[in-house]
Structure formats: structure tokens, C-alpha cells
Amino acid sequence: MPREKQKRGRRAEDKAKKDAAKRKRDEGPEESAVKRLKPSAETNTSNNEIISGADYIPLGQDDGGNDVPMNDAPANDMPFYGLLDSEEQEYFSKANEVLELNQFHDAEERRLFVDSVYREADGKELKVACSQSCSRLMEKLISLSDMRQIRRLFSKFIGHFLHLVQHRFASHCCETLFINAAPGVTEKISKSKGRKAEVDEEDEPEPELSLAEMFMKVVEELEGNWGYLLTERFASHTIRVLLFVLAGEPVDLSSTDSVVASRKKERLGIVNTEAPEEKAAAEKRKVPEVFEATLKKVMNDMVSGLDNTYLRALATHPVGNPVLQVLVFLELSHFGKASAKDPNSIIRRLIPDDDFGENAESSTFVRGLLYDPVGSRLLETIIKSMPGKLFKSLYKNIIRDRIGSLARNTTAGYVVLRTLERLGKDDLQDAMESIIPEIPGLIERSRLIVPKVLIERCLVRGVDTKPLSDALESAYDKDPAQRLEQMLKLEPAASEDDSEEKRKQTGNNQTAAAEKLHGSLLAQTMLTASGPVSGLIYSSLLAQSPDSLLRLAKDPTASRVLQQALTAPTSTSQFRRQFTTRFSGHLVELALDSSGSHVVDALWPATKDLFFVKERMAQELLNEELSLRDSFVGRAVWRNWSMDLYKRRRGEWASKAKGLDSIENGQRERPKSRIDLARAKFAAKAAEESSKAPVAAKT
């Protein structure tokens, strides 16, 4: 009997099972599902409520919930502008390398190269700006562009700014574009024939809008999203730049206390960029009248939708705090301090009370900012810009009695610095007496910026610095030589047994480098104060051994102290006569060192009244002419000491060394002629008679 074909039967059996399963699903859901399906994001919440057995599940959560758009939050769908292909990536990468090397013969060659890159990027500007690898190239191009190129690029970005300012890479391009376009907001569109011919040759139309009109377009695009962009991590720094441009305020990213750039902003500077444009960006500018009204409206729109509680919460928000600083600064400085009286102003909403009472709302807010790493920066801005009457009340009720303990704190200490800058002579005297007991602890923990600023303010206000000098002297070693080494954090001379690895580890310690820098800045500030404060540094310098002086001169940070000591107005001829001779025999060694060469340069003005010392030093340099000419820093020293003049025309060099020959600097005064002397005599006589006239009339 033939065997049954099992294969065909199994297929039929499987098909029957599938049909049965389909019928079962059509009839009703199974109580126990065999296979778990991954829930979608939209239904995950409702499923959890069903499984957990919630007592109440509101209707309409699932049915038709996706059909209603959410209008409260801005759309998060970032448009995709496309990707650069491999050839384009390679071209722009090479262009970036060329700009980094900056080996152009002249500015014209660099301009032609920038033009060629712009032609290659035509139509791909948005792709380049959003590219992780090429956005830096776009920033460099903008920095090297003229106003015509900036206007063309600006016009390409119009219509996309709402998305670009929120992009991780394109936001930095927008920031650079705003900074470089700011000086041209008052320029009118030129329609010269040469420009028309250039446009026809490049076959690219010139934008019809001026830069001022383009900035207004940017404001229109961002309208209605200010409240969201205020705390958007990529848009925040671009919004700050836009506010400064509208206000005509300088946009200086190199400033240490600038709140314009983002915290992680890279310095993509190019060597030999046009100095006038950089200077224009760092100066206050004239802006069109429409900018002021627009700025006021934008600032109002940013905070009008926020209640006072949320506005104060921005003070400690890492992203919103810098924008709030800019808003407070512009409100108090640009629109006048009288705006602080407006109850709807930002400063009045933050600090509603003038008296700063014990339980006042303003006191609670300010005390909360004092020790907050983020909020203290806003408090610094408020103290710098707030009206005098409000500042006096704040200082009297919150800071004055606690200024010593506040100076000890690493965060509140910066608020103390801003406070010291606004105190009058009497209040500064009292503040100094409160801070002096804390000086030893501050120096022990390398918090040297507080005594540094205190010395500067005492010099400005004319406060006696003798108590401060005594506190500094007691805080350091009694030995003058050790005192300077402690202040500058100088390490003992490295022996031959020290390993190279240990030296590298010491050199890479950022904390030690920062402490050395602050010690050097404190010593330089002390040298500007006449009397016992500068005497502490001068006595320490005279107590140094020759080897120690060489170490000081070759140290990049410590050598600044030597330069300041040689050229400061407090430096006496007696000190310079003793100190300058210590460098004899080591001038060539120092002149060939990158840091020591600056000390040799400082010896030229330091020996202005010590001609015999200067002549001896010049002869020492002349003996090693070949060594100096073979070195870059050596050639600079040779030039600054006018050694060619010393070598060929010794008499002219002597006149210049004594300060008699100042034609080069334009300092020589033309001898007065007889008519000039007669005019001066007549003017003095007329002034004397005019001063006597009121007295005679009164008698």
C-alpha cells in the first residue's frame, strides 16, 4: 500500500490553523495575548492606565487625540536642507585648511580665494551652515567677507532664521553673521557702475534690502517665539547678539566678562583680519531709529508672557540667565536708569522693594543669588547698572555687614568685586577694614583677585593703603626673597634627576597655572601703588639672586612683574640703578628667550636716565650680533634697541638713548618764536585782568 504524502498534508494543516486564528480574531479579542506588541508613544500612557486599573480614565485621550495640533509649543520639526556630497565635503575641507594656514601673499589674494569659495558654495549655503564639519568654514568666511558678500549671504538666510538659530552648528554661523553685519546697518546700498559690472560678471543679483532691513526681517521671523528662544540652548547666544546689534552696543567676544558668546564658543580668529572691522564691532555704533522701537518691543515680548515667579527662576537658569543679564543691562543703560521706576520694567519685577527689609521679597531674591554660581552673575550685572539710590539701599541692608564673609566665598566674592567698584571713599574705607582680617585666608586659598581689586579701588578713591600693606606683609613670608616666590608660585629650580614626565605633569596643571597668573596680576597691581604696597615687591626683587632673576625673566607669567617694575611710574631711579645692573652679562641669553626678550625691551626705557648702563648693555648686545640676527625674538630686541643706529651713527644713538632725539615719536616740541611768546604773554595778562574784574566791581 503506497505511503501518504505527509508534506502536502502539513501545508494544508498549517493553512487551516491560520484560517481558524483569523476567524477567532474577527469574533473577539483573546483574553491572553500570546505575542506582545511594542506600544507606540501615543498609546503608551493610556495602556498603562488600563493595566494599572485606574479608577478614572478621561474620555478623548485616545480617540482623535492625534488630530488636534498642539499650538502651545513651537514646532520641533527641524527642516532638512540636504547633505554635501563627498566631492563638496573634500573641497570645503581643503578650503578650511587653506584659511587656517593663512599663507596668502597679500589681502588681495585672500579676497580672491574667499570669492572662489563663495562661488562654489552658491546655492549650498544652508547645507554648509548646518554641516558639522563645514560650519566652521562658514564662520571664517563671514569673518573675512566684505559688506557686499555679507549682504548676499544674509539674503540667502532670510526665511530660515527661526530654524537656523536653533541648530547646533548653524546658530554659530548666524551669530558670526550678525556680528560682522552690525557695522553696516547704517550704510546705504551703493549702485555704482563698477558694482553693476561686477554683478553682471558674476551673474548674481544684488540683494534689494539693506542690512538694516534684513535685521528687521530677522525680528519678524522670530516674532512670537521669543519666550521659547529665551531658554533654547542653541538659540540663546544668537538672541543675545541680536539684542546688542539692535541696541548699537559693542559686540566684543574677546572680553572676559562678555555675556554675548556661548560658554563653549570657539575662537575661530584668522590672523591679519581687517582691523577696522574688528574695531567697529567692539565700539558703540549708531543704529537706525527704527531699531530702538524694535528693541523695546522685542524686550517687552520676551518677558510679557512670563509671570514674576518664572522671571526670577530665569536668574538661576543656565541658558536663560545670560539673556536676562542682557535684558537688565540694556534696560538700565540703554533706556536710562529712570526706567527702573516703571513697575512693569524687568528690574522692578525682579526687585520690587526699595528698602530691602529683613523679610522683603527683594531681600529673599538677592540673598538667593549671592551664593548661586549662575544667579550671582545676574546680581553682578544688576549691581553694575542699577541706580545709585537702589544700590545704596542694597549695600546697606544686605552686603555691608557681611562683606568680609562674602569675600571669602568663591561665588559671592565676585559680587563683592562689583560692589567695591561702586563704593565711595568712606564706604570703601569701612569695607577695607572688614576685608583685611580675611586677607591671610584669601591668600592661603589663592583668592588673590579680592585684594587686587581692593588695591585698585583704593588708588582710585584715594584711600590709605598702609593697613592693606601690613596685612599683605603678614600673610607672606618675612624673607623678601621668599615672599615673591610665594606670591608667584615659583617652583624650585628643577634638578637633573627630575624626570621629564614629572615636568610635563606640572606644566599641564591648569590650577597651578591659574594661581601663578593671579599672583602675577596681584604683584603688578601692587607695583602701581606708591608707598609701602609697591615697596613689598621692590624689596623682594632686590633680594633675588642672579639665578632666581633669570628664572623670573624666563617665566612667561613672572616676567610681567619684572617688566612692570622696570617701567612703572612708582619705580625710582635709585631702584633702577641697583636693579638694571643685575642683568649685565645675561642680556643675550634673555634676548634669545621668548619671555626674557620682553624684559630686555623693558630695560630700554628703564635706563632712560642711566646712560652709562644703557651704553654698556648695547655693547653687550653688539658683541653677539650674529646670534641675535639668527633668532626671531633676537631680531626684535635688536630693532627695539636701535642697534643699527648704535653700530653706524653712535652720536645719534646717544641722543636717542638720552631722550633728546624724539623726532621718530613726534615728541619734540618746536621752539616758540617771538610772536608765540608775545601771544602767550598777552593771553596770560588778559586772564589775570578778567579774574580781577569781578572783585573790582564788587568793591
UniProtKB/Swiss-Prot annotation:
SMART domains: Pumilio (SM00025)
Name this polypeptide is given: Nucleolar protein 9
Entry's Gene Ontology BP terms: endonucleolytic cleavage in 5'-ETS of tricistronic rRNA transcript (SSU-rRNA, 5.8S rRNA, LSU-rRNA); endonucleolytic cleavage in ITS1 to separate SSU-rRNA from 5.8S rRNA and LSU-rRNA from tricistronic rRNA transcript (SSU-rRNA, 5.8S rRNA, LSU-rRNA); endonucleolytic cleavage to generate mature 5'-end of SSU-rRNA from (SSU-rRNA, 5.8S rRNA, LSU-rRNA); ribosomal small subunit export from nucleus
Gene (UniProt): nop9
Skewed-composition ranges (Basic and acidic residues): 11-27
Function noted in UniProt: RNA-binding nucleolar protein required for pre-rRNA processing. Involved in production of 18S rRNA and assembly of small ribosomal subunit.
Basic residues: bias regions: 1-10
Annotated InterPro entries: ARM-like, ARM-type_fold, NOP9, Pumilio_RNA-bd_rpt
GO terms, molecular function: RNA binding
Domain of life: Eukaryota
Source lineage: Eukaryota, Fungi, Dikarya, Ascomycota, Pezizomycotina
Keywords from the UniProt entry: Nucleus, Repeat, Ribosome biogenesis, rRNA processing
Protein's organism: Aspergillus fumigatus (strain ATCC MYA-4609 / CBS 101355 / FGSC A1100 / Af293) (Neosartorya fumigata)
